[in-house]
Regions:
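HIT superfamily nucleotide-processing domains
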Residues: 1-139
Length: 139
């Protein structure tokens, strides 16, 4: 059975995408810790982070840096935290989380957001990515 992320990638479930290329996608998480919280995911359904092919892992990190710059431009956080947890969904993924302090990286702070809130955040982030010249934010 495909993971929930694969189902989002395939369009079977809704997702508020901010990045799509041949290897990875990024979309807003439905339970953000803070506004601008993004999930960055390889298209290939791989459970464990350490099983992701090296070239894909390198690409994930390059894209993570680009999205981080856009998050900083859009929301002006002190930092953008990057977390690889891997417990809730058996599909490797990175969390990019705008943060003002270490406590902002606690999943205990996650709260469900409305579709409208997620769409607005995605629109803001795509605009910041486009301002950086990132074509992968357009599809």
């Amino acid at each position: 059975m495909p993971s929930i992320f694969t189902r989002i990638i395939n369009g079977e479930l809704p997702g508020h995408f901010v990045w799509k290329d041949s290897e990875v996608v990024a979309f807003m998480t439905i339970q953000p810790i803070r506004e601008g919280h993004v999930l960055l995911i390889p298209r290939a359904e791989i459970d464990h982070w350490d099983h992701v092919p090296e070239a894909t892992a390198q690409h994930l990190m390059r894209v993570a840096q680009r999205i981080t710059r856009a998050i900083k431009a859009a929301w002006h956080p002190a930092r953008v935290g990057l977390i690889v947890a891997g417990f809730e969904v058996p599909h490797a993924h990175l969390h990019l989380i705008p943060a003002e302090e270490m406590a902002d990286l606690s999943f205990a702070r996650a709260k469900a957001s409305s579709a409208e809130e997620l769409a607005a955040a995605a629109t803001t982030l795509r605009a910041a990515l486009r301002a950086q010249g990132e074509a992968a934010a357009d599809w």
